[in-house]
Amino acid sequence: MSVVIRLARAGTKKRPVYHVVVADSRFPRDGRFIERLGYFNPLMPKDNEARLKLDMEKVKGWLAKGAQPSDRVARFLDAAGVKKREARQNPIKAVPRKERKAQAEAAAKG
């Protein structure tokens, strides 16, 4: 059973509130879950303490059991200092070729 810590949408139309839940990865986004760990209200100001509420003891327990956080939950945990978020792959899109690099250096010198 692959267990994830993720957000489940709640609230009304155009007024979302998200529950932070532990669920099997095969369950629907807003469907069955194992345990509710907290909530996230994106409509509140960013500096408001009630914007994100997590039970850190339960979160640490589930991480110790091997639960994988979703991307957004990983950001929350990184901000809280619970788990360091891995850097994402950022490939270098356009590396100049050698001759263009040499031309750019020559133009910069004089």
UniProtKB/Swiss-Prot annotation:
One GO term in the molecular function aspect is: structural constituent of ribosome
Q: Which UniProt keywords apply?
A: Ribonucleoprotein, Ribosomal protein
Locate the region Disordered: 87-110
- Entry annotated with the keyword Cell wall biogenesis/degradation: no
HAMAP family, per database record: Ribosomal_bS16 (MF_00385)
Q: Which family does it belong to?
A: Belongs to the bacterial ribosomal protein bS16 family.
Instruction: Supply the name of the protein.
Output: Small ribosomal subunit protein bS16
Species name:
Bradyrhizobium sp. (strain BTAi1 / ATCC BAA-1182)
UniProt lists the gene as rpsP
